[in-house]
């Protein structure tokens, strides 16, 4: 509603609070209270989307509160507001681990139901799906290069405002279901990964390529520092 939008604007502008984050925290606490039993461990992923007060309440219901962040403080500075709310914190971003004394943990592959099709029957040579941001010019240049070499590709960009246009890119303004993304991944020979500015942590796409035994093209040079790099 208009009232909630105005209220949320005031909270964020003057009190550095987000109404959605407060709501998420309250809803999680409701579920925790239903269990009515102290937990050995509570693991919170993307804790920057929950208000610090709720996270501190989580700690009353567990022996240990652990957080994992698959975004970095450069892109999501609110992570810094909740760092002190956990007993133990893991991050996929090495720079954040060094700067804030966090523990390092990579991302993972969670698409356990994805099947990898035969390379000879794959519809696309190269596939990428991403959100609209500063990576778009790089993606466009790669698309132009692949097209000039007659290499088949499927590049999809989620653009909520649907303002961008490029003949080599498919733009969508609603989130694509994970099952549909998995179909595109399965039906492609090579996955393309373009890391965000200020990010060196490896994305999920890297681990999907490992799990599905697909080739990977990435702009992230830090990949050479991992033990699986060849």
Which positions does each model-derived feature cover?
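Short beta-strand/loop segments at the ligand-binding rim of alpha/beta enzyme cores
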Residues: 58-69
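Nucleotide-sugar donor-binding catalytic core of glycosyltransferases
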Residues: 1-31, 35-39, 46-54, 70-203, ...
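Short alpha-helix at the nucleotide-sugar/activated-sugar donor binding site of glycosyltransferases
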Residues: 209-210
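A short acidic/histidine/glycine-rich donor-binding loop in glycosyltransferase catalytic cores
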Residues: 230
């Amino acid at each position: 509603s208009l009232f909630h939008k105005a209220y949320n604007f005031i909270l964020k502008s003057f009190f550095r609070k987000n109404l959605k984050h407060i709501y998420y925290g309250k809803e999680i606490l409701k579920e925790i209270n239903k269990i009515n039993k102290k937990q050995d461990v509570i693991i919170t992923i993307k804790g920057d989307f929950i208000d610090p007060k709720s996270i501190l309440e989580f700690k009353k219901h567990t022996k240990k509160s652990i957080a994992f962040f698959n975004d970095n403080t450069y892109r999501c500075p609110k992570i810094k507001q909740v760092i002190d709310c956990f007993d133990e914190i893991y991050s996929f971003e090495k720079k954040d681990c060094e700067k804030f004394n966090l523990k390092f943990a990579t991302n993972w592959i969670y698409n356990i139901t994805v099947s990898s099709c035969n390379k000879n029957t794959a519809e696309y040579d190269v596939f990428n799906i991403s959100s609209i941001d500063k990576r778009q010019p790089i993606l466009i240049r790669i698309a132009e290069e692949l097209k000039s070499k007659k290499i088949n590709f499927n590049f999809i960009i989620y653009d909520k405002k649907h303002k961008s246009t490029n003949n080599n890119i498919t733009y969508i303004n609603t989130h694509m279901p994970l099952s549909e993304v998995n179909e595109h991944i399965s039906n492609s020979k090579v996955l393309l990964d373009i890391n965000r500015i200020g990010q060196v942590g490896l994305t999920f796409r890297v681990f999907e390529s490992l799990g599905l035994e697909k080739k990977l093209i990435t702009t992230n040079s830090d990949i050479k520092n991992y033990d699986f790099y060849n």
